[in-house]
Amino acid sequence: MRDILIGGAWPYANGSLHIGHIAALLPADVLARYHRAAGDKVCYVSGSDCHGTPVAIRARQEGKTPEEISSRYHREFAECFRKLGFSYDYYGRTSSEEHKEFVKEFHKKLYESPFVYEKEVPQAYCENCGSFLADRFVTGTCPECGGEARGDQCDACGTVLEAESLENPVCAVCGSEISFRSSRHLFIALGRMEQELKNWVESHENWRKNAQTFSERYIKEGLRDRALTRDLDWGIEVPHAGYENKKIYIWAENVLGYLSSSRAALKDNPEAFRQLWGLDGEKQCEDEKTEIRHYYVHGKDNIPFHTIILPALLIANGDGWRLPDEIISSEYLTLEGKKISTSRNYAVWVKDIVDRYDGDSLRYYLLANGPEKKDADFSWREFVNSHNGELLGAYGNFINRSLVFIQKYLGGTVPEGIPNQELRAETNRLYASVGEQIEKGRFKDALDDIFEFVRKANKYFDSRQPWITRDTDQKDCADTLYNCVQLIAGLAVLLYPFLPFSSERVCGWLQLSPEWKRQQVEPGYRLPEIQVLFQRLDKSWWRKKMKVWKEPVRAEADVAG
């Protein structure tokens, strides 16, 4: 048994989720469901990022408080994740008392570190808005590549920036020119940790290529010290004398949500929390040590915050927190060949699609066709085809034709039969290979292998022709259907991490547990009433979706329905 932490990135609570968010976060749920089925102790956490200027600006636009805005989207996020089957052990929010209390404790210790110091720096100020601006709300020209960039990061080249380094900076809220005012802040000396971080990054060849490449490039360019505090109204108070009117910079507290939420998830067992984070490792005898693994799942725009910023904070704090083991960083998802744009409402909003379509349909499409290794495109036509062709036509068809045949011709009872050793051996092999692929973050390969086995199962049914042998060779017919039931049992468990809704239904029909091993359905078991697993989607309706985006849109509208 292993101790597993799985952290999904925390979405900003200033607007609705779109399918690009889900494409990046969904692998975390596959990992959580698999590791639980494999018998590991899992702590799967995430939450809503409620602080920072994006939320404050949305609140100002709507005439509400930041707390009201973040609470609304937090509730919406939690409901969307529930409808998509995300099995969080704890889904929190950065505005919760639990998170704020933990962050203050962490930062108090952090400020005692030799890596933290004070410095007077220029901070972006917009005269028109009458407020200081977070770096992400300053736009201008990137000094590295010449592209349009925000004050915190250039999406074009991936460089982590400071607002004052931009050329021709303007306020992203109102478009006015900005000035920079001197302000005293706490800084973390990333430059002094550069060699330690470099050695750590280079020791993780298991990371996805984008995580390795981006992280190595950031370090090679030279890590710049970053401010831990900012002149903001909405955020967590700085636990340091003289900083009563400032807030902890959002990047220095939101990544600590993995720590605060796992502590909340394990509040009844504080020793388990300490063990999960390696804080009591020295107290354990070598032969008693539990294997621990931490996964962080997010989009590639969040890579530096998980491979540089979070490790730097954990190191500087000095308490011995475990650093990330696995970085599962997805590429970008486009929509019908174009970049998703929330400002133009060119997106598929999760709150709409989950109310109309089966959660497993979206899960399957994004896992089988998502941006795992390279940018991927969401196409309504292909979404329909993948549902009708793979889920309904291959997997659902095999289950339905097999179980309905038993109900119709064999009295609804699983028959006695001789196990097919080749199929049994392949099922066992799949449990091993699919588990290994999931642990290495190769979800598409794992799903492809399972569906190749689905196609083999359908071929087995066709080649055995039970619709003929039920009249000509009842023993052969019984053998066929017995083995088909065992195949269904194997497929339901293998697909459980990917397609939990349909797998739970099949496991219920056959009285199976999601335990990660080949399971047997005994002869004589009487089947309950079997219903269709997936409904066919109308091939014509994707054209209606395309028509929506040919018309002007201004706000979050119902573009998914």
PLM features per residue range, with description:
Residues 30, 68-79, 105, 394-401, ...:
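A non-catalytic, amphipathic alpha-helix used as a structural packing/dimerization or gating element
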Residues 78-81, 107, 111, 396, ...:
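Structural signal for well-ordered, non-membrane alpha-helices
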Residues 139, 194, 347, 380, ...:
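Residue-level signal for cytosolic alpha-helical hairpin/rod architecture
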Residues 2-46, 98-102, 167-408, 448-450, ...:
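Structured secondary-structure scaffolds
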Residues 1-200:
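N-terminal, positively charged nucleic-acid-binding surface of large information/translation enzymes
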Residues 1-3, 43, 47, 119-129, ...:
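Basic, alpha-helical terminal appendages of large translation-related enzymes
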Residues 209, 393, 441-448, 497, ...:
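Short, solvent-exposed positions on alpha-helices
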Residues 301-303, 366, 373, 382, ...:
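Active-site-proximal binding-pocket segments
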